[in-house]
């Protein structure tokens, strides 16, 4: 049996695909696996922010097409980069155990404090708004490109610091670059940050991913994505959600910024098997507060 695994071309995307491949091979040593990488539209357009070029769908369109055309059997994604509406023909068939979900700040090589005369680079309004709260008066500017490209721009002196996801740096073996780790209270992470998602066609036998799949990650991802979807939040809309499993419950924290720039943050607990309802009800409560 041969499985073709589709991935974006970046070093981090390939590393994440390799994590999935290693798990499949560990439990199914007879399966032959081929990695197929491709550049997505989102990888090609680097001079505009995500919301200006059509949102998260631009990072999955080519991978979805390859799946539908039968060119690959599964695709591997950072779950946080996937659009809220997923093609019914291409379900998520497995998710990884969650890596550290926190956001971090990285300084240029050789520096050990932020020079506030220069901008802090970050890729989403979610991070921007929360960083401006932590460092009042700082300048935050957009940054695009994969993790290594962003680090290159930082080290060239284009930014005084950049905000990134802990998980990406850890998977790339670049943890030593981390200068400050923000708690999930200081910066609420993007929904599903730190989780790898595997997508396939409906007829795919996902049993080869049974040992890879993590139920805790799945349950919190359902709640987090439900919250964002209820707010109509795409990639750069200022919203975030972070769920933690406590026994049979999920404690879900939602973050939302209304059109006037007012920040709302609320936590709600619900049954772990009712994540969709929990995310939706938290979003409705926050929108009610925003309309009041």
Swiss-Prot record:
Keywords: Porphyrin biosynthesis, Transferase. Coiled coil: none annotated. Its cofactor is dipyrromethane. Binds 1 dipyrromethane group covalently. GO terms for biological process: protoporphyrinogen IX biosynthetic process. Belongs to the HMBS family. The porphobilinogen subunits are added to the dipyrromethane group. Pfam families: Porphobil_deam, Porphobil_deamC. This is Porphobilinogen deaminase. CDD domains: PBP2_PBGD_2. GO terms for molecular function: hydroxymethylbilane synthase activity. NCBIfam families: hemC. Tetrapolymerization of the monopyrrole PBG into the hydroxymethylbilane pre-uroporphyrinogen in several discrete steps. Signal peptide: none annotated. Monomer. It comes from Acetivibrio thermocellus (strain ATCC 27405 / DSM 1237 / JCM 9322 / NBRC 103400 / NCIMB 10682 / NRRL B-4536 / VPI 7372). InterPro entries: HemC (IPR000860), Porphobilin_deaminase_N (IPR022417), Porphobilinogen_deaminase_C (IPR022418), Porphobilinogen_deaminase_C_sf (IPR036803). It catalyses: 4 porphobilinogen + H2O = hydroxymethylbilane + 4 NH4(+). HAMAP family: Porphobil_deam. It comes from the Bacteria. GO terms for cellular component: cytoplasm. The modification S-(dipyrrolylmethanemethyl)cysteine is found at residue 235. It is an enzyme of class 2 (transferase).
């Amino acid at each position: 049996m041969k499985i073709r695994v589709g991935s974006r071309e970046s070093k981090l995307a390939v590393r994440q695909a390799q994590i999935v491949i290693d798990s499949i091979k560990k439990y199914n040593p007879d399966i032959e696996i081929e990695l197929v990488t491709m550049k997505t539209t989102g990888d090609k357009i680097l001079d505009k922010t995500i919301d200006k070029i059509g949102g998260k769908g631009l990072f999955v369109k080519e991978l979805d097409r390859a799946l539908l055309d039968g060119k690959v059997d599964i695709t591997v994604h950072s779950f946080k980069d996937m659009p809220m509406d997923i093609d019914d023909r291409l379900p998520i068939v497995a998710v990884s155990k969650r890596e550290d979900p926190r956001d971090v700040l990285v300084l240029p090589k050789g520096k050990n404090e932020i020079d506030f005369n220069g901008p802090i680079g970050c890729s989403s309004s979610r991070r921007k708004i929360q960083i401006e709260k932590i460092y009042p008066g700082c300048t935050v500017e957009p940054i695009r490109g994969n993790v290594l490209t962003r680090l290159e721009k930082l080290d060239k002196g284009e930014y005084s610091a950049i905000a990134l996801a802990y998980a990406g740096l850890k998977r790339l073996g670049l943890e030593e670059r981390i200068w400050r780790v923000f708690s999930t209270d200081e910066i609420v992470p993007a929904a599903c940050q730190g989780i790898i998602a595997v997508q396939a066609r409906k007829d795919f036998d996902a049993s080869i991913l049974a040992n890879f799949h993590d139920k805790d990650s799945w349950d919190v991802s359902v709640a987090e994505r439900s919250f964002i979807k209820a707010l109509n939040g795409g990639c750069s809309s200022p919203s975030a959600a972070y769920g933690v499993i406590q026994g049979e419950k999920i404690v879900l924290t939602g973050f939302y910024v209304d059109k006037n720039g007012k920040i709302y943050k609320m936590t709600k607990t619900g049954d772990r098997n009712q994540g969709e309802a929990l995310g939706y009800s938290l979003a409705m409560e926050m929108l009610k507060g925003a309309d009041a």
